[in-house]
């Protein structure tokens, strides 16, 4: 199509039609399904542009068409791909001058959104939580606009964040929601007579916003070619009481031996040593400045605390010889490996101490201020400048030492935001303006996000693909959310939690808010579960049930040898991780969702498990939803079973109503009622068959229910089977040697118990007869 500036240009695919007027930079996007102009009006910041339509073929998204707009100082594009449910927005900035150009932030356009709902019935979901559009302070990376009642709406998200950090702002404008996407670069350098490509934004309309969020995450995974390893479950030493922090070389073997016997058979496979193992540097009593001034070291101008430099020791090249592991970290890792565990270690790859013996003569390894002093970020400390080739080599060798020489195959990387050279904003959820770009790097052509991503790539290169890498944590500064895409196996998606009710909700809130990233972009880490006897049992069940059902990283951090048997059994019922993708039911109804659903069909039948959570520790509640709203398959009647109460809830029809005492939960397996016997639940795992049943079959000719189950040695395995009226159990057998089988039927419920002296996949058969 020939270039023009005035006439309307149109592109379309099966889902959308885009109309654009180049002369004004105004465009409109319609969803064909309901003939809805969900972007009523979009407006590029460039005007008087020439335009053309081109056909493209993308290596990831395939065939498509783009509207290309070209102005004097920038270009813009709107693209539709045949295979994608999103509209893609891109652009370039042009530097036509003879001097370099610096861009700190870039706001390409604004979008007026309408989803056929009054604005009063709409909420936006972003990193700041569930808000009215006008109350959103700005969301990092993504923002969803949805109907509270109907779930329809739009999802907008930055697909790429390779050089800049994506933010989306919202406001209410009469009967519409106005979105303003923005990229914060900090400092993007465009050389003379050159141009810079900006990040890519995607926007799409969906009947269920959850579908859109999940597909957005799928697009990120496709763009960055993300392939996740198997999700592990494990133990972190930090919160344990006693023996917290890094634990020590006397008590860690005691813990590991106990876990090997009690929880490893159920699926606990890593043990990670946390902070306080490392070489001494910053002394928490008094800082040895070694001839440097506070000003050189970066003391903040407004800081009144005499211990402004307080934070973790930050020399990760060696252990503290007077610390918890005097025999060294190689010995610690070997002791864990010998017992069959993946050894894990905490460190801060981008935060190091310039005053430690290792680095005192290498001040050039650190980011600087404009006046030549060191740039300091509160708590984590001084920032390694990865653009300096010598610092680059130093970090590479440090990671290789930890993984290849010491033998740690699980890394927990704390203080990640130091890699961007920006403020600590903890706890950071909604957008906060920071000092991104003010720190001075060796290579000033690299943006802060670019430096950060290169640092993470270096860690992966040095560690190898067989090392599991967990980032920690986005709440220190949310620049690390999108900046980490494609470079980590897991990410702490919130701040530190704790065993008290207010603190334990931190993981579920952040893990719900960002649920769609889990299992697609990385594994969400909500911080550990707690089982300690000092904690109310119902609160332990509440947190454990949420983590286990949501499928997010399951980590324990109590002194497990002291757990009462009842609480140790809870740990067994949440291991291993099911490895699937659950979703919240009420994502746009409650800031902290109260209902989750997990669905699986791997065993040949569909299994649905619902989690109901009362996060209020002062008030009882009742939650009622229709089967359709819950996401259950269409059926006239359903059978339900309460896992923790170990009892059948009978049959319900169109809706399920659940009563919850304050600060409690219920985990309920649901299946459509059939005209023959079927397995509704098991006692092995909170998912009630999803983790353990590998097959289930009904033979109508032989009146036989058969299947295979993964059984743990010495753990009585119970099948909870619904037996419709007119049937009774006749015989039961196990085809696995040494595995005993027994059963008891009461009315319409059968309990079949299998016992195996070894962990094995057991084949079982139960015959029935008509009564």
Predicted segments, located by residue:
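Beta-strand-rich recognition/accessory modules
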Residues: 12, 83, 106, 141-231, ...
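Carbohydrate-binding surface patches
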Residues: 87, 148-150, 547-550, 555-557, ...
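Solvent-exposed beta-hairpin/edge-strand motifs
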Residues: 110-122, 628-645, 722-737
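Solvent-exposed beta-strand/loop surfaces of large extracellular or lumenal domains
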Residues: 168-179, 635-655, 731-753
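Glycan-recognition surfaces
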Residues: 359-393, 397, 446-565, 589
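C-terminal beta-strand-rich structural cap/linker in extracellular carbohydrate-active enzymes
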Residues: 652-690, 746-771
